[in-house]
Amino acid sequence: MSLMIRSSYVSHITLFQPRNSKPSSFTNQISFLSSSNNNPFLNLVYKRNLTMQSVSKMTVKSSLIDPDGGELVELIVPETEIGVKKAESETMPKVKLNQIDLEWVHVISEGWASPLKGFMREDEYLQSLHFNSLRLKNGTFVNMSLPIVLAIDDDTKEQIGSSENVALVCPQGDIIGSLRSVEIYKHNKEERIARTWGTTSPGLPYVEEYITPSGNWLIGGDLEVFEPIKYNDGLDHYRLSPKQLREEFDNRQADAVFAFQLRNPVHNGHALLMNDTRKRLLEMGYKNPVLLLHPLGGFTKADDVPLDVRMEQHSKVLEDGVLDPKTTIVSIFPSPMHYAGPTEVQWHAKARINAGANFYIVGRDPAGMGHPTEKRDLYDPDHGKRVLSMAPGLEKLNILPFRVAAYDTIEKKMAFFDPSRAKEFLFISGTKMRTYARTGENPPDGFMCPSGWNVLVKYYESLQESEAKQQAVVSA
């Protein structure tokens, strides 16, 4: 799929969000104006019920968006209680977690899924699966488009029996926390897959890795984690929790935070978009917009570039000044990747609300993939941004769709696509980029910063060496 980047912006809006108060009533609905208007800033208007005024009359004050439910959930046991809680957990039935289970424990415990306080019980699961949202006690709704559940097999269910609490055991064998007041219910895999992905075709990466081999039961309950989840992979310092990110935004006195998620290396088209977004936010009247560059750090499919390589590449982008370190925060989003298109992109946006971002950049075919059995995209590439503009529970988040960027063969750089010069632009797909790196061929000058590109070349060289050694062993 081509790396097509779209961006449009809000023009002439008034925002007044005093610190420590609730944000303005702001809807994420979008309407596209006539394409004959050449100003990209006017191609998108956010409808809301505040009076529209000129930018020159705008009043902007620094304030972060409220987390879903009004309070950020943190489920780490206080240090003074850890000894007692650990002793209690030793007497509980044990539930063994796999790596993706652990990633979900990480997500829930830090509050990315606020107001969710544990793996879903059946009522929460059904609301998420059928309505993409959860109803709170006060009657309001928050977005929750992906079921966050823990599967167990028949033997584990039998061992739990009538116990109200269970201990959670990480893949390395240590007890890391517990689920309390548990509820066990049937895991209807086919229904879950069909409703989440819109297909039950074989070849869905998350399904084959996680759901198909999982147990026939789901267990929900209130989560307690003894210590923050660490992976000891040299990247934990990048894994800032929503609370830590909010504190960092405050420390930098950010009055707007725009989040950009990716699971690929950053090329200059991405950088063009992010830098242009900041420029437009400044034109809107914001004084200190901060970019949250937020690569996904959980499960990804086998042919995606590994997290450690991506993080090294991202660091080179900042070192080379392609992105400004003073106005950019690079952090890892710990969620596993579903590749569930418009359903999943709602989760990605919702989690950034809890982290304090009030603008979210969405691109072509977000969270999408090629159809696993047919030669076509699994989802309509434009549906992701359209769904975000209408999704219940995301009204307070401002959605910024991408503007198309491609390689300008005349200017020798990544630039916003000009339809009147269509033949002078080159779209470099992710597949093409990987082919360049694997074969040692350099992409066109200006596509990616050289030091960042070298990171990818070295990775693919090491991958080829490893594959050659494995082949030699097989052939021996």
Swiss-Prot record:
GO-annotated biological processes: cellular response to sulfate starvation; hydrogen sulfide biosynthetic process; sulfate assimilation
Keyword Methyltransferase: no
Pfam family, one: ATP-sulfurylase
Annotated InterPro entries: ATP-Sase_PUA-like_dom, PUA-like_sf, Rossmann-like_a/b/a_fold, Sulfurylase_cat_dom, Sulphate_adenylyltransferase
Residue interval of the organelle targeting sequence: 1-56
GO molecular function: ATP binding; sulfate adenylyltransferase (ATP) activity
The keyword Nucleotidyltransferase appears for this protein: yes
Coiled-coil annotated spans: none
Induction: In roots, upon sulfur starvation.
UniProt EC number: 2.7.7.4
Family that this chain belongs to: Belongs to the sulfate adenylyltransferase family.
UniProt cross-references to PANTHER family, sorted A to Z: ATP SULFURYLASE 2, BIFUNCTIONAL 3'-PHOSPHOADENOSINE 5'-PHOSPHOSULFATE SYNTHASE
Protein name: ATP sulfurylase 2
Source organism: Arabidopsis thaliana (Mouse-ear cress)
UniProt lineage: Eukaryota, Viridiplantae, Streptophyta, Embryophyta, Tracheophyta
